[in-house]
């Protein structure tokens, strides 16, 4: 990963974290890794655990970012979520939501909960 892409990714994750906090989420973990899988942000609100992918777009204003969630991405997120839950037994009885926080320099944050 290029240094520029890493900086943009970190910036996007900070913006997304602030956004999630503003709508009542508590951030539990950022950049959680399990085997070869990663979840950008894990948060909780009420009795729901949110596993969120963050996408930072500079262009593609008409692009629907939900299409980035192909089968392979869903599989990796599920695997990482299972790993997180196996390490955090007290959270296993919570509902789970897989989400996307899309950040566009022109549109701001768009939040897509319950993608799959």
UniProtKB/Swiss-Prot annotation:
Span of the signal peptide: none
GO MF annotations in UniProt: nucleic acid binding
Stored SUPFAM superfamilies: Restriction endonuclease-like
NCBIfam families reported in the protein's UniProt record: PRK12497.4-3 (NF009157)
PANTHER family cross-referenced by the UniProt entry: UPF0102 PROTEIN YRAN
Family note: Belongs to the UPF0102 family.
Name recorded for this polypeptide: UPF0102 protein LBJ_1427
